[in-house]
Amino acid sequence: MTNIRKTHPLLKIVNNAFIDLPAPSNISSWWNFGSLLGICLILQILTGLFLAMHYTADTTTAFSSVTHICRDVNYGWIIRYMHANGASMFFICLFMHVGRGLYYGSYTYMETWNIGVILLFATMATAFMGYVLPWGQMSFWGATVITNLLSAIPYIGTNLVEWIWGGFSVDKATLTRFFAFHFIFPFIIAALAMVHLLFLHETGSNNPTGISSDADKIPFHPYYTIKDILGALLLILVLMTLVLFSPDLLGDPDNYTPANPLNTPPHIKPEWYFLFAYAILRSIPNKLGGVLALVLSILVLILMPLLHTSKQRSMMFRPISQCLFWILVADLLTLTWIGGQPVEHPYIIIGQLASIMYFLLILVLMPMASTIENNLLKW
């Protein structure tokens, strides 16, 4: 008799995705981040659900309800900090996952890659709306500044912003709708992640060499299930270390002050995972130009398959491209640092140079390096 996992309509799907899936025999730890992102998402949905049971989306009580969760709810503090720091772990995994895709040329799987970019946008939107919910100073002013950027859109800008706000400023209507969206979005992300996986399984996984691995496949279980479990344990170890030893390390002290529309904090800045994009936004002295640069800094990922000029898929055997890739990583770290600094000399010029460097590397230098490598190999 055939095993039930191969015949049952539901188990068959699980079997083909996680058990009998033919996987390349040489995928490294950089291929662990997909499963880690899945774990992060499940963790965020569960902790978020329990937080939503005690949270109230009202301007007068939101801040107090978060305090109440931390002080009075059984293990509320750990749920709250797991959710807040879980978002940071989520973005660390996301950046690693995208970086892996860029390095090993995974973007040549067009459908998988494009859904991935949509997932990145959706996750960023969700995190932004979640940051508004505790209704601290940085929540309120972050929401005001970022939503206000839409007013740079010609003709419809102002109407669009007021429509999103549900009034003439960030207020009760804004908070309630952000809570509603923040609750629904993770489920949309989960659905998109399943589509992401569906498209990936149409082609099979890429591998570090970028060469077809059809001649050398191994079953996903037990080899990669055990590898994913190790990754998950390390993820939970790092997360719980953060939560139990320094839960506020990545947060902003201003968010422990209740939102006050009459008092602007001296330095308005988003969470650390948005700082690179915030630095690019601030480096352009024009409002519309800044907004366009901000959107393009992420949207440029969609162009990656078009900018791929190399005859090889992966960067494994391309030292010049490797060098430029790590310069890009260093550039993004520089932008992240600049995004958290005040707008004054010398930070302004550093931010502008780093922003120019970012687009120059992706749009010009990396495609050029690929062409040079082709010529060096007489291809």
UniProtKB/Swiss-Prot annotation:
Cofactor(s) needed: heme b
Residues binding heme b b566: 97, 196
Coiled-coil annotated residue ranges, if any: none
InterPro entries reported for this sequence: Cyt_b/b6_C, Cyt_b/b6_C_sf, Cyt_b/b6_N, Cytb/b6-like_sf, Cytochrome_b, Cytochrome_b_C_euk/bac, Cytochrome_b_N_euk/bac, Di-haem_cyt_TM
Entry's localization field: Mitochondrion inner membrane
A GO cellular-component term linked to this record: respiratory chain complex III
Principal subcellular localization: mitochondrion
Cofactor: binding comment: Binds 2 heme b groups non-covalently.
Keywords: Electron transport, Heme, Iron, Membrane, Metal-binding, Mitochondrion, Mitochondrion inner membrane, Respiratory chain, Transmembrane, Transmembrane helix, Transport, Ubiquinone
Membrane topology of the entry: Multi-pass membrane protein
Function summary: Component of the ubiquinol-cytochrome c reductase complex (complex III or cytochrome b-c1 complex) that is part of the mitochondrial respiratory chain. The b-c1 complex mediates electron transfer from ubiquinol to cytochrome c. Contributes to the generation of a proton gradient across the mitochondrial membrane that is then used for ATP synthesis.
Family statement: Belongs to the cytochrome b family.
Subunit structure: The cytochrome bc1 complex contains 11 subunits: 3 respiratory subunits (MT-CYB, CYC1 and UQCRFS1), 2 core proteins (UQCRC1 and UQCRC2) and 6 low-molecular weight proteins (UQCRH/QCR6, UQCRB/QCR7, UQCRQ/QCR8, UQCR10/QCR9, UQCR11/QCR10 and a cleavage product of UQCRFS1). This cytochrome bc1 complex then forms a dimer.
Note: Heme 1 (or BL or b562) is low-potential and absorbs at about 562 nm, and heme 2 (or BH or b566) is high-potential and absorbs at about 566 nm.
Name recorded for this polypeptide: Cytochrome b
Native organism: Cephalophorus niger
Gene (name only): MT-CYB
